[in-house]
């Protein structure tokens, strides 16, 4: 796709900084670069140049790279200016670009959008790039690299090729059934592979829960009766003061949360109001919110300072959530606990039991040991399209007429195509590219 306008933006972080990167892309890139720096540098070679205004006043000096299209990030002529990252320097260069005819400031995600529309990236790679920029943990980085690097897209493309081959065999039987060189009932040979493909898609969908934990974090809720040590545990796990800790029961009235990194995974830790019956309006609202986050939890740490206080069933009706029973304040002489009465015996004051608790938390994280690639659907729209593809494959295997079989295989292929953006995704584009910052 050819664009008539040329866009520019600061692609690095906000100044001041040691270095700032300004990106330009579009048909007027070469002219804009020549007006700033003189003769064009060799393609894809970092060259030190003096950057000047239209009146030849010096703005700065820095490295300049020129990428003639289509061998560039966006697929069109593109350049990057690596200059000093002071506010005045960056502002002056952007003002100089703004004064040039045919140039305008880029919108959020517009460089990536041009890369997509010029066939340099597909939608899965674009989403992976957005996730890579936002990644805060090692597992988020690994998942994003798998997608932005094309590994996930290659999997879907392979499935699409198998569907295309199956359709070709069926349609060959439809169109050339009377020809001697077309074997009879050739379509029967492809159904074993179609069944295997459906199983592969189902297995892939089953891993979506792992991807959700990687992207959004494992939700761990600290629950228990008032004054059981919930806020102290939150502070100990966060290694800083998040919650107010007092000996007064009912100090925590609202749900507090903190994001942690545990064994490379993102963990969202919630501290909740003490669970008890009360007539106090504010505390009752806090308990209602506590029940709500317990219902959404992946794991509950149920705390008690007395063996008789481990009661969660009455606070989470209708849902079973994994629970770790944590005996707290065990540095005190009373009460005496039996080893069977709790899973972890903990004192946030002395640190006793913290290592065991952390080990138990890690045991609830997905086991990805030995997996160098993380091939799994990371977004709800991926899962929806995969389910549509799987359902179409089931219908194709149940159909008796060749025309219906071929049509269902076409629908399955279209569903896979919507994941990568090759089919009917125009309405999605604004949402996806809005996740990017300006300059990417």
Curated annotation (Swiss-Prot):
State the needed cofactors, names only. Answer: K(+)
Enumerate the GO terms in the molecular function aspect.
GTP binding; GTPase activity; metal ion binding
Enzyme class, top EC level, equals: hydrolase
GO BP term, example? tRNA methylation
According to the UniProt record, one GO cellular component term is:
cytoplasm
Q: Which Pfam families match?
A: MMR_HSR1, MnmE_helical, TrmE_N
Tell me yes or no: is Plastid among this UniProt entry's keywords. Answer: no
| Cellular localisation | Cytoplasm
Tell me where on the tree of life, at the top rank, the source sits: Bacteria
Which Gene3D superfamilies does the record match to this protein?
A: P-loop containing nucleotide triphosphate hydrolases, Probable tRNA modification gtpase trme, domain 1, tRNA modification GTPase MnmE domain 2
Q: How does it assemble?
A: Homodimer. Heterotetramer of two MnmE and two MnmG subunits.
Q: Which family does it belong to?
A: Belongs to the TRAFAC class TrmE-Era-EngA-EngB-Septin-like GTPase superfamily. TrmE GTPase family.
Its recorded name reads tRNA modification GTPase MnmE
- Protein species of origin: Sinorhizobium medicae (strain WSM419)
Q: Which gene encodes it?
A: mnmE
């Amino acid at each position: 796709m050819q664009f008539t306008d040329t866009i520019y933006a600061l692609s690095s972080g906000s100044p001041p900084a040691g270095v700032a990167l300004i990106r330009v892309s579009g048909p007027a890139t070469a002219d804009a670069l020549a007006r700033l720096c003189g003769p064009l540098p060799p393609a894809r070679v970092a060259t030190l140049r003096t950057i000047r205004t239209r009146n030849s006043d010096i703005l700065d000096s820095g490295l300049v790279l020129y990428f003639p299209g289509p061998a560039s990030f966006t697929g069109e002529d593109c350049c990057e200016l690596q200059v000093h990252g002071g506010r005045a320097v960056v502002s002056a260069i952007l003002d100089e670009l703004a004064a040039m005819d045919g140039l305008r400031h880029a919108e959020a995600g517009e460089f990536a959008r041009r890369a997509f529309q010029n066939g340099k990236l597909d939608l899965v790679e674009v989403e992976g790039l957005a996730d890579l920029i936002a990644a805060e943990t090692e597992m988020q980085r690994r998942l994003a690299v798998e997608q932005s690097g094309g590994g996930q897209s290659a999997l879907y493309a392979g499935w699409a090729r198998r569907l295309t081959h199956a359709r070709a065999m069926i349609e060959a039987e439809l169109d050339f059934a009377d020809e001697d060189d077309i074997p009879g009932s050739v379509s029967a040979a492809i159904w074993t592979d179609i069944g295997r493909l459906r199983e592969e898609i189902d297995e892939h969908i089953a891993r979506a829960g792992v991807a959700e934990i990687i992207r959004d974090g494992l939700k761990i809720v600290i629950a228990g009766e008032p004054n059981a040590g919930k806020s102290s545990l939150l502070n100990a796990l966060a290694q800083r003061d998040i919650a107010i800790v007092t000996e007064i029961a009912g100090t925590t009235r609202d749900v507090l949360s903190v994001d942690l990194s545990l064994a490379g995974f993102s963990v969202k830790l919630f501290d909740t109001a003490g669970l008890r019956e009360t007539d106090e309006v504010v505390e009752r609202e806090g308990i209602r919110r506590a029940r709500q986050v317990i219902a959404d939890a992946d794991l509950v740490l149920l705390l008690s300072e007395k063996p008789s206080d481990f009661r969660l069933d009455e606070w989470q009706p209708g849902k079973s959530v994994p629970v770790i029973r944590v005996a707290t304040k065990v540095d005190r002489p009373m009460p005496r606990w039996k080893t069977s009465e709790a899973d972890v015996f903990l004192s946030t004051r002395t640190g006793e039991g913290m290592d065991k608790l952390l080990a138990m938390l890690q045991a609830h994280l997905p086991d990805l040991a030995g997996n160098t690639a993380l091939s799994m659907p990371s977004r709800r729209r991926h899962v929806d399209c995969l389910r549509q593809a799987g359902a179409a494959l089931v219908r194709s295997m149940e159909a008796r007429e060749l025309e219906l079989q071929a049509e269902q295989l076409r629908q399955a292929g279209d569903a896979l195509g919507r994941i990568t953006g090759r089919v009917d995704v125009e309405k999605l584009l604004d949402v996806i590219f809005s996740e990017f910052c300006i300059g990417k």
